[in-house]
UniProtKB/Swiss-Prot annotation:
Organism: Trichophyton rubrum (Athlete's foot fungus)
Family designation: Belongs to the peptidase S8 family.
Pro-sequence residue ranges: 21-126
Domain Peptidase S8, residue spans: 135-412
Listed name of the protein: Subtilisin-like protease 6
Enzyme class: hydrolase
Length: 412
């Protein structure tokens, strides 16, 4: 995954339908979290109807004793609510089979899917330049041909743009960020640090002073994965919701700030309608999102949020413009970016070299921030701009997959 560790791709299948509500089941290899579910409402459901539904749920939970079989510990019930852009409303929590059946009988509910484990995906005219770049990916994005050691870029370098890194956190004190990184929110544990390193590496590629594409961008840590690089799908969606609200000026819809914001998700799990709908809500709010395609060397349509068409899905390339052997592929892939043996930042002030589509995606996020800083329009349409600028050079990209490798338009 660049994704660092492997996420298991799976297609969710409809298990049953009760009064129009689908109850989905994950395939046999998904790491489902016992008794945890995400309940997604129909798009036409109003805020008032959503609140009425969750009020009913709370009252219903209070009126019954929900206990696990063979255990005296009660079920937690509803734990989080989500509202993204006025078009995606959902909640998640811990429920027994009887409660799931009751919830599914409500006409306002679109579908219910099990919560599961999500993991990292690692395995110009006024140009300035950086010689002897510490990571080959920088030189490749700034040049039409491979093999260079200089990164050519405009000195605007993403200034005035904010990048939300939805990951394991960021070492915001790393000297390469020069004070441009800050802590946002934590949705997975009580440690407001990057105890894994994945998020810091990703953020370094997006906006490090030496290691980043957008050297002037502001960075915000949104922690959704723990020290082991894993978390729940529901927790990831909660982080997506928070980031969208911040990027939209703290509100629920599109604001001027949205067009000056980018997001990176170097993570993924089995295909999830809930995750894809949340990603679409972010795109609909006018925010550009780069997403890792995954590291299973298979069609990325089986992974989320990579399979959501409105995001910019990124596969990983090698130093000689080949497809990285681990990289996912397929029609949902928008572009390739450097993802094999990428050197970037490590918590504690040092560096590390990692491989994965997790490393490719931040090249695209950083390029998105860079282009917005140059005056290009932000939002999901920025992916089309990036594709038009890209060069069709990837050798054997995979069946039905683009061969386009990102390029910053330096003219070099």
């Amino acid at each position: 995954m660049g994704f660092i560790t492997k996420a298991i791709p799976i297609v969710l299948a409809a298990l049953s339908t009760v009064n129009g509500a689908r109850i989905l089941e994950a395939g046999p290899h998904a790491e489902a979290i016992p008794n945890k579910y995400i309940v997604v409402m129909k798009r036409e459901v109003s805020d008032e109807a959503f609140n009425a539904h969750t009020t009913w749920l709370s009252q219903s939970l209070n009126s019954r004793i929900m206990r696990r079989a063979g255990s005296s510990k009660p079920m937690a019930g509803m734990q989080d609510k989500y509202s993204l852009g006025g078009i995606f409303r959902a909640y998640s929590g811990e429920f027994d089979d009887a409660m799931i059946k009751d919830i599914s009988s409500h006409d306002d509910v679109d579908f219910i899917e099990p919560d599961f484990v999500v993991r990292t995906t690692t395995n110009g005219t006024n140009l300035t330049h950086q010689d002897n770049v510490p990571s080959w990916g920088l030189a490749r994005v700034g040049s039409k041909k491979p093999g260079g050691t200089t990164y050519y870029y405009d000195p605007s370098a993403g200034k005035g743009v904010t990048a939300y890194i939805i990951d394991t956190g960021i070492d915001i004190d790393h000297e390469d960020f020069q004070g441009r990184a800050k802590w946002g929110e934590n949705f997975v544990d009580q440690q407001n640090t990057d105890c894994n390193g994945h998020g810091t590496h990703v953020a370094g590629t997006v906006g490090g002073t030496k290691y980043g594409l957008a050297k002037g961008v502001s960075l915000v840590a949104v922690k959704v994965l723990d020290c082991d690089g894993s978390g729940s799908n529901s927790g990831v969606i909660k982080g997506m919701e928070w980031a969208m609200r911040q990027a939209s000026g703290g509100g629920n819809g599109t604001a001027k700030a949205a067009g000056k914001s980018v997001m990176n998700m170097s993570l993924g799990g089995p295909r999830s309608e809930a995750s894809n709908q949340a990603a679409k809500a972010i795109s609909d709010a006018g925010i550009f999102m780069a997403v890792a395609a995954g590291n299973e060397n298979m069609d990325a349509q089986h992974s989320s949020p990579a399979s959501e068409p409105s995001v910019c899905t990124v596969a990983a390339s090698t130093k000689d413009d080949g497809k990285a052997d681990f990289s996912n592929y397929g029609a949902v892939v928008d572009v390739y970016a450097p993802g094999k043996d990428i050197t970037s930042l490590k918590p504690g002030g040092s560096t590390d070299t990692l491989s994965g589509t997790s490393m490719a995606s931040p090249h695209v996020c950083g390029l998105g921030a860079y282009l917005i800083g140059l005056g290009k329009q932000g939002g999901p349409g920025l992916c089309d701009t990036i594709k038009k600028m890209a060069n069709d050079v990837i050798q054997s990209p995979g069946e039905g997959t683009t061969g386009k490798l990102i390029y910053n338009g330096s003219g070099k």
